[in-house]
Amino acid sequence: MPTTFQEIPRERPVTPLLDRADTPAGLRRLAEADLETLADELRQELLYTVGQTGGHFGAGLGVIELTIALHYVFDTPDDRLVWDVGHQAYPHKILTGRRNRMLSLRQKDGIAAFPRRSESEYDTFGVGHSSTSISAALGMAIAARLQNSARKSIAVIGDGALTAGMAFEALNHAQEVNADMLVILNDNDMSISRNVGGLSNYLAKILSSRTYASMREGSKKVLSRLPGAWEIARRTEEYAKGMLVPGTLFEELGWNYIGPIDGHDLPTMIATLRNMRDLKGPQFLHVVTKKGKGFAPAEIDPIGYHAITKLEPADKPAAPKKASGPKYSAVFGQWLCDMAAADNRLVGITPAMKEGSDLVDFSERYPERYFDVAIAEQHAVTLAAGMACEGSKPVVAIYSTFLQRAYDQLIHDVAVQNLDVLFAIDRAGLVGEDGPTHAGSYDLSYLRCIPGMLVMTPSDENELRKMLSTGHLYNGPAAVRYPRGTGPNAPISGDLQPLEIGKGVVRRQGEKVALLVFGVQLAEAMQVAEQINATVVDMRFVKPLDEALVLELAGSHELLVTIEENAIMGGAGAAVGEFLASQAVLKPLLHLGLPDIYVEHAKPAQMLAECGLDAAGIEASVKARMVKLGL
């Protein structure tokens, strides 16, 4: 196996067994003795594929053996296999008839980064956000019972995703309805237990065997007739298992817990899964894997190798670097440290996105004021509300797509009480290859309808810094939404001065047409304005809207064009239209933004072009409307 990034194969490896296992049916025709060799081939294939396309890396390497075992033992796709999040699903895609399409992974018109029902019958549930698998698999298990079907339902969830409340809600409900389903905990961080070895593997085989299950059920029927006897026996079994395995929590929730077992020991996994396949009631299998298994750099640095960019040919000349500024997330991270030094009331909160949201420096400089709440967006927001009640100034650093999961808390716990919570909303707009499940397409729409909410959209790095200061000093809930990637390299002021709330800025004076820009499309708007001599306005604030400026522009121009990287429906442009209607002002309007579709994965530039939000698309749309109006 390769030991460095440069050693990842650039040519498709020779894989005679994998060639015969292109589908689960083909896999099940292989001898069990061949499966470990197949695992080596699949690992090489995954290294090659992701090296060519880029994408999620470490998680897939860690579940090679688990994926093989699941498709070998269960009758997929008739048996329903649900992957949580989907970062680990690349081996699953390779084994389910999509190997020859893997080089289109995450590319325009190619296969998706995550399981998609529309892509394959083996993708039984579409995912992207975490902690949904148990609920989905439970729904499938209940449906199977209602349909008198014997098909199995299996959820595979990581130890990180299991921290979310939704997962425990599903675990609790499953035991209430005594669902026939299997949950597999893919523990690749060893955060629950390190007790893995020969003894626990042996114990798992015993506890999952039909003999043990039959004896257990028979004893339960007998002892249930004696008051208190079954409870004593259950506790005795629980304590005995608890001495060797860490499953007490799941046993208390009513699940039959098996494990932990070595997730890279194929014979043990296959034997255990065969035993558990026909057990009744909710079954829980704890599998310990190593993220990045088989590729030393990823094993050593699983966070750094969570995802990688594609390998370029060794002889390819380096592409000239475009002039660009720092990443927007880096600007936020620097501001957070600067404001924390100036205001000891500031605290930083993130739901498991320390690296992505650029809170690493803050966490190291102010560890007592940094709170990573794990994958618990609802808790993160209400935690911030509680802190704000006591005079703290919380900053919730969160991706736009994940803030959707805490919308009730945002309204009920923060906004209704008018609490001082600043939401630093990263990955707003289109995010590229991860596709619609990770896009931040709706935040302006769902934020601007909340009374008292301050909503800002920066056009560059310096505007972002000023808006963060504005939100921090605002009395009430505030949100700043900014995109993934780098800015236009605007000079950044080192001060912490706020903006005047609700005031836009005219960046270019033209005639007839005014381009009202909400966000980072300002540069494209300026290009277009040069071609048609349009006025360009950096609106800055979605709420409160600069109503005086909008009225002024409506009075001095023949066409107003709103531009935003948000859903057109209910977005910033809609706010302009609603205001003009309320003032009985009739003025031609053109709203440019994200259409009423899920924009499929592609490179960000391709997605913007598809939506008409690049300079060429904006110019074409504006000119077409000018022709209609006779301008």
Swiss-Prot record:
The keyword Transmembrane does not apply. GO terms for biological process: 1-deoxy-D-xylulose 5-phosphate biosynthetic process; isopentenyl diphosphate biosynthetic process, methylerythritol 4-phosphate pathway; terpenoid biosynthetic process; thiamine biosynthetic process. It is an enzyme of class 2 (transferase). GO terms for cellular component: cytosol. InterPro entries: Dxylulose-5-P_synthase, THDP-binding, Transketo_C/PFOR_II, Transketolase-like_Pyr-bd, Transketolase_BS, Transketolase_C. Binds 1 Mg(2+) ion per subunit. Pfam families: DXP_synthase_N, Transket_pyr, Transketolase_C. Pathway: Metabolic intermediate biosynthesis; 1-deoxy-D-xylulose 5-phosphate biosynthesis; 1-deoxy-D-xylulose 5-phosphate from D-glyceraldehyde 3-phosphate and pyruvate: step 1/1. Thiamine diphosphate binds at residues 87, 128-130, 160-161, 188, 295, 377. One of its GO terms (molecular function) is 1-deoxy-D-xylulose-5-phosphate synthase activity. Its EC number is 2.2.1.7. Its cofactor is Mg(2+); thiamine diphosphate. Mg(2+) binds at residues 159, 188. Keywords: Isoprene biosynthesis, Magnesium, Metal-binding, Thiamine biosynthesis, Thiamine pyrophosphate, Transferase. It catalyses: D-glyceraldehyde 3-phosphate + pyruvate + H(+) = 1-deoxy-D-xylulose 5-phosphate + CO2. Homodimer. Belongs to the transketolase family. DXPS subfamily. PANTHER family: 1-D-DEOXYXYLULOSE 5-PHOSPHATE SYNTHASE-RELATED, 1-DEOXY-D-XYLULOSE-5-PHOSPHATE SYNTHASE, CHLOROPLASTIC. Catalyzes the acyloin condensation reaction between C atoms 2 and 3 of pyruvate and glyceraldehyde 3-phosphate to yield 1-deoxy-D-xylulose-5-phosphate (DXP). This is 1-deoxy-D-xylulose-5-phosphate synthase. It comes from Pseudomonas putida (strain ATCC 700007 / DSM 6899 / JCM 31910 / BCRC 17059 / LMG 24140 / F1).
